[in-house]
Amino acid sequence: MANALVWFRNDLRTIDHEPFLRASTADRCFAVHCIDPRQFETTELGFQRTGPFRARFLIENLTDLRSRLRSLGGELIVRVGRPETVLQHLLPSLAIDAVHFHHEPRTEEADTAESVQQLCDQHGIATHVAYGDTLIHPDELPFEIADTPELFTDFRKEIEKQCEARSPLEEPIRIHGTLPEEVNAGDIPTLESLGLSTPPLDDRCLNQFTGGQNAAQQRMEEYIWNEDRLRVYKETRNGMLHPNDSSKFSPWLAQGCLSPRMIADHVRRYEEERVKNKSTYWMIFELLWRDYFRWISRKHGATLFRAGGLRGVNVDWKSDRELFRRWQDGTTGYPLVDANMRELRTTGYMSNRGRQNVASFLTKNLGIDWRWGARWFESQLVDYDVASNYGNWNYAAGVGNDARGFRFFNITKQSRDYDSQGEYAKHWLPELRDLDVTEIHEPWKMSPERQQEVGATLGKEYPHPIVDLFDSAKENETIYMRAKAASH
């Protein structure tokens, strides 16, 4: 009798899941997810590596996955512990012959997988590793992973010319996975047991993310088909306020309740049944960005996380805790930055447009180590994934392969361009709700009398700008260019 174990990682789904599909043909198919306590440690900056929003989403995802596996005849074993330690005890208890899991192209996760591989080798247990978190399967890449083009444009052109995404795999019809009496399925942890508090509800939160494959599929149906928003995705994707400005698939992608191929399959059908346009192309374009960061992460490994980034530009970053705290709290005096940072802290989400602006401000105006920002995003974002997060921060800080040198965002211009009426800023900054359109983007230009009239006195209800936008950029450009010259 052959017994197989599926080690679920950041792939919490039953559809388009090669390890699960292969394991389902065994006489008995078991499944486990390990909540690694290292992911909940406190960083040297004083906050937890995984904050309450992502942790709550994980709990919901595991609850949904357990329910789905039970409906198929199986069970999800949940353990808190390092995977290699958990499996050391679990493999003999279940008399496992083969372990099936997805590869994750990231340094820390790869080290964990190697430890599991060694454990299985020691016990004569077969391991089967598959790839499932990219749009294009590595077997179909027109280059070796070690030869992944350094620039996204080169990567994209080669992929578009030669590759097509595979269709998603079907879900197994039935599995035989009843646990032996001596093996307990284990409880899915609570936020409290993970050392976290339940985040308070805030009626300003317009984006509701419920974990699980079922909720992910409902979101695809709603966004693509029911609301027909894919048709205008390219035009609306930079919006920051409304739930359907962009797809909001990213939380489910990050923890693997959706695969990129599941999304691409819907896009293909949409193009056949409704329309093929720039927006449908752009949805696939964004998934290719995601692929790019994954293969670059695998190619360069730990280099992605060093201060000098992929390009080795060793900028003399500041370590100013007070400036960093003001950025975290959304009290910089720049409404676009502050609104986005308060949304992040209140909801665990921020638009892509917002992320670009706050990252630019932290690195190009405050001159603070980009890795501090990356770690804060890791802690707060419900859709955090390591390759995209650190890849994008490399880019924003000017230390990534695709970075354009010292390119900084004019925050006030961005505010006018993407929040022209100030709706988003006023939504998250109620102290500025009575400012008119001419004032909301630069409140520091109001006269003292006008500040008092609208209840937004600078230094009292709303802060003065903590730096001058252009003077600070000029100062940090000098520091950056010096480091760039030294790196050649």
Swiss-Prot record:
Pfam families: DNA_photolyase, FAD_binding_7. InterPro entries: Cry_DASH, Crypto/Photolyase_FAD-like_sf, Crypto/Photolyase_N_sf, Cryptochr/Photolyase_FAD-bd, Cryptochrome/DNA_photolyase_1, DNA_photolyase_1_CS_C, DNA_photolyase_N, Rossmann-like_a/b/a_fold. Binds 1 FAD per subunit. Binds 1 5,10-methenyltetrahydrofolate (MTHF) per subunit. GO terms for biological process: photoreactive repair. Keywords: Chromophore, DNA-binding, FAD, Flavoprotein, Repressor, Transcription, Transcription regulation. PROSITE patterns: DNA_PHOTOLYASES_1_1 (PS00394), PHR_CRY_ALPHA_BETA (PS51645). Residues 2-135 form the Photolyase/cryptochrome alpha/beta domain. GO terms for molecular function: DNA binding; DNA photolyase activity; FAD binding. Its cofactor is FAD; (6R)-5,10-methylene-5,6,7,8-tetrahydrofolate. It comes from the Bacteria. May have a photoreceptor function. Binds DNA; probably functions as a transcriptional repressor. PANTHER family: CRYPTOCHROME (PTHR11455), CRYPTOCHROME DASH (PTHR11455:SF22). Belongs to the DNA photolyase class-1 family. This is Cryptochrome DASH. It comes from Rhodopirellula baltica (strain DSM 10527 / NCIMB 13988 / SH1).
